[in-house]
Amino acid sequence: MSNVTHQPKIGFVSLGCPKNLVDSERILTELRTEGYDVVPRYDDADMVIVNTCGFIDSAVQESLEAIGEALNENGKVIVTGCLGAKEDQIREVHPKVLEITGPHSYEQVLQHVHHYVPKPKHNPFLSLVPEQDVKLTPRHYAYLKISEGCNHRCTFCIIPSMRGDLVSRPIGDVLSEAKRLVDAGVKEILVISQDTSAYGVDVKHRTGFHNGEPVKTSMVSLCEQLSKLGVWTRLHYVYPYPHVDDVIPLMAEGKILPYLDIPLQHASPRILKLMKRPGSVDRQLARIKQWREICPELTLRSTFIVGFPGETEEDFQMLLDFLKEARLDRVGCFKYSPVEGAGANDLPDQVPEEVKEERWNRFMQLQQQISAERLQEKVGREILVIVDEVDEEGAIGRSMADAPEIDGAVYLNGETNVKPGDIVRVKVENADEYDLWGSRV
């Protein structure tokens, strides 16, 4: 008689932003540690977990469709994530969902899984769980989540109502996780949160401990400590607080990547006030100039919203003028979309869709020209590139100026003698508005 027991199998669908990806990885790690197998096909799974996004209406729709697909293909579905905070909305469309939890409800998700698909009593697979946790990103880069929630109340955003106020992770825990990632082969750490520059504010920047040494709970201290790991460290979602100035010298010294992702959202003081965002555009331009003087290699990424309620042609022109003067390297632009529960929904003078579309096109046309000019300046120079993919035609990687998924790529045509995670020196030979082409030096 066989003593082989059935290993319970879980399907997993992860939607949304990198912060959601981190939540998914944490749940997956716990499941694998307990002896569950994670499978890629609905019909192989005993149950499916859908980690949802609910930030904008299109994301809500995508999440609802993913839940529906999981129900049709499998039938046993647990929902978690941001949209899970709106249980009634999910139940109205999908009443057969077994359980619904909100964001970062790891323990609740696991309890529900245990109820419907009991965990195996004996787990001989524990040692198979990678030391750096189960990752949904390639092995050579990883997201490092340093906090949850946000203290800001931007009128276009509902994240605080979904994820709550800022809660910083203990700096010792963050640094220990980073060390485990590096020990497991990670070459690039991407620091993420809802508001990276606010790290430690909620605990009054108290002193924590790592390896027996005192470390202040702050973004600057975190960067100084991460720089000792000898890998690329990239900062995302940095709110433009004054102390952001203090990380620029670390970038100039090569301690962390000269890359700053600062969502500025607009340039009209009036619109920024309606958004409840900081509104001194002249001050921001002066800071950008100062940052570039300290760190000439600095790459600046930002995101903007066009068609926000009340935006006039004059407001929009201020945004275009800001782009021309700031000459940002990487820019994302979104047409304003109402989000259920957001304060901006109640603002007067909603902008017609055709006007949003026209302004978005003008914005993108201008920024593409600026991006192309910025990248053209790199032609003839040598840069470091981290390799992401290799096939028979060559390799694709990213420079220090490129975050995965959202920025450009560096194409190394014909270069096959490398592997993902390698960092190589490349001479840039060509550029367009987004990407670079070059050869290994």
From Swiss-Prot:
It is found in: Cytoplasm. One of its GO terms (cellular component) is cytosol. [4Fe-4S] cluster 2 binds at residues 150, 154, 157. Keywords: 4Fe-4S, Cytoplasm, Iron, Iron-sulfur, Metal-binding, S-adenosyl-L-methionine, Transferase. One of its GO terms (biological process) is tRNA modification. It catalyses: L-aspartate(89)-[ribosomal protein uS12]-hydrogen + (sulfur carrier)-SH + AH2 + 2 S-adenosyl-L-methionine = 3-methylsulfanyl-L-aspartate(89)-[ribosomal protein uS12]-hydrogen + (sulfur carrier)-H + 5'-deoxyadenosine + L-methionine + A + S-adenosyl-L-homocysteine + 2 H(+). GO terms for molecular function: 4 iron, 4 sulfur cluster binding; aspartic acid methylthiotransferase activity; metal ion binding; protein methylthiotransferase activity. Its EC number is 2.8.4.4. Residues 376-441 form the TRAM domain. CDD domains: Radical_SAM. It comes from the Bacteria. [4Fe-4S] cluster 1 binds at residues 17, 53, 82. Coiled coil: none annotated. Disulfide bonds: none annotated. Residues 136-373 form the Radical SAM core domain. Its cofactor is [4Fe-4S] cluster. Catalyzes the methylthiolation of an aspartic acid residue of ribosomal protein uS12. HAMAP family: MTTase_RimO (MF_01865). This is Ribosomal protein uS12 methylthiotransferase RimO. It comes from Salmonella paratyphi B (strain ATCC BAA-1250 / SPB7).
